[in-house]
């Protein structure tokens, strides 16, 4: 896949894209919109840009009429990509009235060095005249707030007792309808005693072989929504080689130049979550991370609020309440993943292969999907909610569960084969501090600048893929093998046999009734 060259998208083009999308009776997928935009304007546009333009952040464009003289009056800026990035940075800062001219100029200079198109050019003199023009071109459009069903508790509210305020909401709700969501980074190639590797891509420092995971579950541990995985490439090499569809494999894939959560992705996630909760009234607990706050604000101001979800933004500085996922859920997920990864390393070493070269991001995600859907017990999730305090007074009897300890023990044994020291420092391997999500002004600038990086056809540190497409005939042979295996087991399970036979029937329909007798004889 060739590189996508970033070019500034004008307000006229954004308005046209929104108008085209929202007037469709059968809404197009984002790839269809990318093709439409290319044919219409002769430009390439990335999937994250499409998602952002369709978000409520640009809903003001729907309520304005483009006047014939607008194009002449609002002449394009000399540095359109810079101003687009700077405006996004300004929005992320909140009330632009608090930003001095010098602050905006400093941010412009930093962004200039990080946007690839400008890196070989000298930094302009950001004069007061330029500043005045920028402010005129990028007035923050106020949107009339509509009544909203969402309840948002955050650090801007009176600092009384955050525990009791959250509990006032959760105590009236069945625990099956109380959800939490949180992100974490993951170095999917990290080895015991290893350190995360970094790379500099045109002024933006980022980690190699890193993804961001978004996990969401309810307080009883009975519901775990599919993982959202954010990487660097819009379509990693291995996805194309294996012809995989992420949704079929129970995860969703998004991308940007920092492999991190953005306001646009978070807003998309919130609306997806709300659609998953159709017909219910649920509570969603999120933390006070800037993309979360901006996404919630965009939705509340859009006039198209969440229908089934009450959002509670947890205070980030409270000693009495914490994010449930931080109380063992994410740690358990990472521990399960590391166990699969270390087992793979040892197996590949025995075969004389380099596991660092033979693995890929798809295999890593499948280990994560397995860990999330089958390896983590409901007890770990329930215990995490009790420890967090979101369900009421802190439960002092809630301690790290035996299930979590039992999960870590086999990993420690495996890691000890590398070194005793690595086994003793198992926590640093399971969840290194560099994987923590950081919310800082420098991080915001890097996230914004990364949107203007050229798309890559592969993940960082991703080797040439050795994955191959599985034919229906291959799948049928595998089913036959599994049926025979299950029939030979002393504790064979009829339910498994029935499931395999049902899947076999599905394969027959897909493959045009492949001849089973021929399969058995080959």
Swiss-Prot record:
Binds, preferentially, to the Maundrell ARS consensus sequence within ARS3002. It holds the Pfam family DDE_1. The keyword Transit peptide does not apply. Its main location: nucleus. The modification Phosphothreonine is found at residue 460. It comes from Schizosaccharomyces pombe (strain 972 / ATCC 24843). PROSITE patterns: HTH_CENPB (PS51253). This is ARS-binding protein 1. GO terms for molecular function: centromeric DNA binding; chromatin-protein adaptor activity; DNA binding; sequence-specific DNA binding. GO terms for cellular component: chromatin; condensed chromosome, centromeric region; mating-type region heterochromatin; nucleus. Keywords: DNA-binding, Nucleus, Phosphoprotein. Interacts with mcm10. InterPro entries: CenT-Element_Derived, DDE_SF_endonuclease_dom, Homeodomain-like_sf, HTH_ABP1_N, HTH_CenpB_DNA-bd_dom. GO terms for biological process: donor selection.
